[in-house]
Amino acid sequence: MAADPIHQFQITKLFSLGHIGGQEIAFTNSSAYMFAAVAIIAVMMLAPGRQLVPGRFQSVAELSYEFVANMIRSTAGKEGLKFFPLVFSLFMFIAVSNLVGIIPYTFTVSSHLIVTVTLAMLVFVTVLVYGLAKNGLKFFKLFVPSGVPIYILPLVVFIEVISFFLKPVSHSVRLFANMLAGHIALKVFASFIAMLGALGVVGWVGAVLPLGLTIALTALELLVAFLQAYVFAILTCIYLNDAIHPGH
């Protein structure tokens, strides 16, 4: 079981919260790590206070704030800043969850499709509801690109509509697949090192290469943890821009 690269993604019940309609509601390891991620973010954002000379936590909080704010301005304009709480929350939650998941014997929340689909659907519904509320029927200009010849316009509109409703799929699967693949690769290399080490001195020598690869892969996963949070957030900003400026 220890060498099984899939075992690390297993959701286990920690305790039961009761039953609703005959269905048990349980607090799982996934729930625990979601709460842990939120707690870490709360400590980072609230604990430092406001100091003239910022400490480590305050510096991280301020850098994260400015990074996300600049991201929104560059993709959705100043009007997009009204969605700052949403984008910032998504970015921080995904980044912290990904980083926590790199620690051995922890759980990676974003490696489960149900989590990433939920986050992507939150963005999709926000875009759809706000776009219709703000623009009314003008929101449907999003599906009619300018400059398209009239004889292929129906086909283009059909493709645009399908593409729009498939956005939550690509938005969620990208994060899920990257985190799943990365952690499986780490587990495979780590298990290989353990098996070689069990062979004695000869195995230790042979384990040098996979150990180096594991270290390099871990460093890459640290980069991917931030990169995937950034990609999810920047795509959120792009989708929000479609709702704010559907005719552009």
Swiss-Prot record:
Listed under subunit, the entry gives: F-type ATPases have 2 components, CF(1) - the catalytic core - and CF(0) - the membrane proton channel. CF(1) has five subunits: alpha(3), beta(3), gamma(1), delta(1), epsilon(1). CF(0) has four main subunits: a, b, b' and c.
The record's section on Pfam families has: ATP-synt_A
- Its recorded name reads ATP synthase subunit a
Which Gene Ontology cellular component terms are annotated?
Answer: plasma membrane; proton-transporting ATP synthase complex
Mind listing the UniProt keywords for this protein, alphabetically? ATP synthesis, Cell inner membrane, Cell membrane, CF(0), Hydrogen ion transport, Ion transport, Membrane, Transmembrane, Transmembrane helix, Transport
* Keyword Cell membrane part of the UniProt annotation: yes
Instruction: Report membrane topology.
Output: Multi-pass membrane protein
- Which residues are listed as membrane-spanning? 25-45, 83-103, 113-133, 142-162, 192-212, 215-235
Subcellular localization(s) per the UniProt record:
Cell inner membrane
